[in-house]
């Protein structure tokens, strides 16, 4: 599907200011002192995540985001090769391997071919879940991996043998985040994300993949979801988005330049892959694959392309994003200095 994200930009009308006229009377009486005219207040941009911020309301530098409509193993390889220049040494691939028989996860043959042709020796990495499901324990997790066909390469459950605390620079909730301990075994990280909706996060892009997916199942995920509330799911909306971003920042800072981000916009249910076969039916059309060295740019471009869909085809996913204040992920990543929300698209199909 050819998607024109530029069409979503509103026409901005600039109002002219009319100066007040004044002067002395015929008797040359002193003119009354003029009061300084109040200038119209600049429109405030709502950054709480409940409203979409169009591109013409954003500012700052631009990053490069690559795009292909080719939803196939070859399309994935083609776009990966544009953002892999700093992927060296021992490579981890963070993706959502899904609950048993989950219908929407990234096709295993695509990942198998990518590893065989472009990242030989790479390891898929995951962590155990916070909720009590098929992947709550390491044993159950490994059984689920077999059921879902992730058997063609090593899969490292990062928190299988413990945790490690990574610093969070500039966080307002965290000074450090608890991660799966094996994260320190790897030199580079490929963030391979199935972009979709999410019950709590509004949407799940590269940020959510790392924020929840790299935090260990017992401590780190609880820090994000519950904090000090005493309730398993006590944190929501803006604060939840901000906590996710701070968790992600720990991973992004840890790998430095040796990290890259790929979002696959396919089978985009409003439900996360955590919901497995219970996921809501897909109503949003497939779009393609996006990739960047900038995590904010790739997630922002993914969101922009959903908003650019015509005839209300993105309605369900957009409603999910806005009702959960999920767009706060983007504005807080910008506030945390994690990337740019402006970008240039390089269309690999042209």
Residue ranges and their predicted role:
Residues 1-9:
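Bacterial N-terminal signal peptides that target proteins for export
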């Amino acid at each position: 599907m050819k998607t024109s994200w530029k069409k979503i930009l509103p026409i901005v009308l600039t109002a002219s200011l009319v100066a007040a006229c004044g002067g002395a009377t015929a008797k040359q009486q002193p003119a009354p002192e003029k009061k300084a005219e109040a200038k119209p207040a600049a429109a405030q941009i709502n950054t709480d995540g409940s409203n979409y911020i169009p591109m013409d309301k954003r500012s700052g530098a631009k990053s490069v985001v690559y795009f292909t409509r080719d939803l196939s193993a070859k399309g994935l390889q083609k776009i990966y090769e544009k953002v892999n220049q700093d992927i060296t040494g021992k490579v981890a691939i963070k993706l959502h391997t899904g609950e048993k028989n989950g219908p929407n996860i990234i096709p295993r043959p695509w990942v198998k071919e990518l590893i065989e042709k472009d990242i030989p020796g790479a390891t898929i990495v995951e962590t155990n879940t916070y909720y009590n499901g098929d992947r709550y324990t390491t044993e159950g997790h490994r059984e689920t991996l077999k059921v879902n066909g992730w058997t063609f390469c090593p899969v490292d459950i990062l928190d299988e043998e413990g945790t490690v605390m990574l610093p969070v620079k500039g966080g307002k909730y965290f000074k450090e985040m608890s991660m799966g301990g094996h994260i320190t075994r790897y030199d580079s990280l490929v963030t391979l994300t199935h972009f979709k909706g999410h019950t709590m996060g509004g949407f799940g892009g590269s940020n959510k993949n790392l924020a929840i997916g790299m935090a260990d199942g017992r401590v780190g995920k609880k820090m994000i979801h519950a904090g000090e509330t005493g309730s398993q799911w006590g944190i929501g909306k803006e604060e939840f988005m901000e906590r996710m971003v701070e968790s992600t920042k720990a991973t992004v800072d840890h790998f430095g330049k040796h990290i890259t981000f790929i979002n696959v916009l396919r089978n985009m249910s409003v439900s996360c892959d955590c919901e497995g076969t219970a996921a809501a039916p897909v109503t949003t059309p497939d779009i393609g694959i996006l990739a960047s060295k900038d995590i904010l740019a790739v997630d922002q471009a993914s969101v922009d392309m959903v908003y650019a869909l015509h005839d209300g085809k993105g309605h369900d996913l957009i409603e999910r994003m806005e009702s959960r204040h999920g767009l706060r992920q983007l504005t807080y990543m910008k506030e945390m200095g994690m990337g740019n929300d402006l970008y240039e698209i390089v269309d690999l199909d042209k």
